Every structure is written in C-alpha cells, then in structure tokens.
Amino acid sequence: MPEVKVPELAESITEGTIAEWLKNVGDSVEKGEAILELETDKVNVEVVSEEAGVLSEQLASEGDTVEVGQAIAVIGEGSGNASKENSNDNTPQQNEETNNKKEETTNKSADNAEVNQTNDYNQQRVNATPSARRYARENGVNLAEVSPKTNDVVRKEDIDKKQQAPASTQTTQQAPAKEEKKYNQYPTKPVIREKMSRRKKTAAKKLLEVSNNTAMLTTFNEVDMTNVMELRKRKKEQFMKDHDGTKLGFMSFFTKASVAALKKYPEVNAEIDGDDMITKQYYDIGVAVSTDDGLLVPFVRDCDKKNFAEIEAEIANLAVKAREKKLGLDDMVNGSFTITNGGIFGSMMSTPIINGNQAAILGMHSIITRPIAIDQDTIENRPMMYIALSYDHRIIDGKEAVGFLKTIKELIENPEDLLLES
C-alpha cells in the first residue's frame, strides 16, 4: 500500500515535528489532500497524500520528530469514512443506516451523539492555530464558541479568555485546570515545567551554534534621524496616495542604505562554506518579525531592484503572513543580510546575533531625543538612534565593519541621496 513520507522541504531542514493529524485512521483521503501539519524549524507545512484512498495507518503520533523521507502514514484502498467537512453530505444508504441506528437507541443517546458530531464538525471548520486546537481539546473547549481577537484566527489566548468568562456565559463545561508541575529540586517553590516548542528549541540551538562557531564582534555608531524624519513627514501623505495606501516607514530607508553599503563592502554580504568564502551577488534582506511563536526572519527578495514602495509593501505583507502563520519555506531561506529593530520594544542599544549562513546583522534601536554638539558653540536636541553591526570577524575586518556602519549613517542622515538612487 502507498506510504506518505515526509517531503523534501528545504536544504537546511532535515526533520520536523508532527503538530497535528488532520485526518484520522479510517478517513477517506483525496489525492493532494493534506493529512497532517508538520512543524519545522522555520514554518509549519501541510503534508499531502499523493494517492486517493483511506488513511489506514498513522506511523507516528502528534509531537513525534520525523525525518525527511521517513514514512509517516499508509494509504489503503476504499472510500473510508466521510471527512468531517462532508459529514452532513450522506448518501441514501448512509442515511438509512443512520436512521436504523437511531431507532435502536434512546432519544437521549441520539441527541448526545448529534451534539458530539456537531462539536467535532465545528472544531474542524473553525480557523485556529495547531496549538490552539490542541489546547482546546485538552481543556474541553468548543472552538466554534470562541471569538478570535485578530484576523479571524483562534489562538490560545482567545481560549483562555473564553474560559475566564463568567459561568453564566459559558455554553460548554470546562475541563478542570491543569495542576502546575513542581520542579523536584525546589519542592516547596511553585514552578511550571513545559516542553519547548520545536521552533524554540531550534532557535536556542542555532543561537548557541552562532556563538560557538563564529568570531562574532559588534561595532556601534549613532545616527541623527532629523533629516529622514522631516523627509518622511513631508512625503508620507503623498506617498500613500501614490502607492495605494502603502505607508512610508523607516525600514525602507535602512534597507536601501544596507544595499548600498553591501555593494560598497561585499565582504558583509558573504558567508564561509568549509574552506571557501561565498560572496553573494544578490541582496535578499531579512527583516526580523516578532510573533507569538518567537522571532521569525522572512526575506525581502532583490531589494536592489525594488523601490521604496515595493519594499514597504513586501515588509508589511511578510509581517502579516508571519503573525498569521502563513509564511512558506521560500520566504525563510537563502537570505544574504538581516536587519532587526529592537527599538520597537524600547531597546536603546543591543548586540544582535548573526543569522545563520550570514556574515553580519544590522541592529536598529529606539529614537531618543538628546543634546548633541552641532559645533563648538552650538548644542541642539536631536532625535538620535544607536545602530549596531554584529559581524563574523573571520570574514569581515574591523575596518570594513566600521566603514559599513558609517555608510549607513551617512545615507540615513542624507536621505535625499537614497531617494535619488531609488
């Protein structure tokens, strides 16, 4: 019988964790239909069946780690059970069998069965994250009765809000809250022990690898944001009118400045592969996005060929996809340089950690008004931002790193030059 195997995902991804089975044993499966959701280091992907038939066996359970090429399910012949989405579209024979079964049971049993079937149907058709589905099952919550806060996608916090509502507003019985586990080393102190998500474990592993396998160093500079802020203020309304509502932000300026600096200092756009150094001739800039599952870095492709509006629109689109868990692998791999903005969280200064397979990362920070000496006789309050470049000293010398950051500073302080180049 045909097997479903973990597909090839990306060169850097060799395994994943089964987040949720979308089909149960005995369910009918169409060719190309998703049967499970797989959580990888970067994104969640749906694994589809290459054959039509019946899911006759699940070779791994939710939470199991599976490798690329590993068999995870068996598809048998036959029509199987109707899927949950089509549970109401019964054939005449199925309807007759259902009627016969109802006659053999009490009205109460039939009513309970019907309610359970409806709940199962509602659980399946509601748009929810995999973790929210598991959380709802564990706590006996009907997802159909949970109101999502954003983007029509039910998340764990929406379920918590539902459970915390007054008892009079509840329509289903809630399962008792889980007892907090106690860490044995401190038996008298309350702690919570929980498994890290696959993505969190992978991030921790990669961050440690970067620290251990690179000669990482950080250099700093400061940028006077006066001119770019004034330019943005003058142009933003007309910019939105000219570009279908796309907002002019600071990220496009820093992205364009980074491309110019990368062209001037190509070592910053390189990586080490064994005994070779690979200098990239393309400019795919990663933009760090904070999500409920941690920090994700999708890439804006070919930034040297895009104008300000195209870059801003792409950044906004990738941010939405990241927060709605809709990023694909193509969005997450093979970048050349990364920009992270700790300023949105209030960070004044930091040393960002290099993204995998890259030589450097640019860190933006909060804009803070402070007194600056304009000349020997003049001090003015100016909106200032500290910028940081963490880099692999094996590839990039200090001279190039300082020069790169100085180029960023000069371009941001003279933003008209960036607009002319674009």
UniProtKB/Swiss-Prot annotation:
It holds the Pfam family E3_binding. PROSITE patterns: BIOTINYL_LIPOYL (PS50968), LIPOYL (PS00189), PSBD (PS51826). InterPro entries: 2-oxoA_DH_lipoyl-BS, 2-oxoacid_dehydrogenase, 2-oxoacid_DH_actylTfrase, Biotin_lipoyl, CAT-like_dom_sf, E3-bd_dom_sf, PSBD, Single_hybrid_motif. Residues 77-184 are annotated as: Disordered. The keyword Amino-acid biosynthesis does not apply. GO terms for biological process: L-lysine catabolic process to acetyl-CoA via saccharopine; tricarboxylic acid cycle. The modification N6-lipoyllysine is found at residue 42. GO terms for cellular component: cytosol; oxoglutarate dehydrogenase complex. It catalyses: N(6)-[(R)-dihydrolipoyl]-L-lysyl-[protein] + succinyl-CoA = N(6)-[(R)-S(8)-succinyldihydrolipoyl]-L-lysyl-[protein] + CoA. Residues 1-76 form the Lipoyl-binding domain. Binds 1 lipoyl cofactor covalently. Keywords: Acyltransferase, Lipoyl, Transferase, Tricarboxylic acid cycle. Forms a 24-polypeptide structural core with octahedral symmetry. Part of the 2-oxoglutarate dehydrogenase (OGDH) complex composed of E1 (2-oxoglutarate dehydrogenase), E2 (dihydrolipoamide succinyltransferase) and E3 (dihydrolipoamide dehydrogenase); the complex contains multiple copies of the three enzymatic components (E1, E2 and E3). E2 component of the 2-oxoglutarate dehydrogenase (OGDH) complex which catalyzes the second step in the conversion of 2-oxoglutarate to succinyl-CoA and CO(2). This is Dihydrolipoyllysine-residue succinyltransferase component of 2-oxoglutarate dehydrogenase complex. It comes from Staphylococcus aureus (strain bovine RF122 / ET3-1). The gene is odhB.
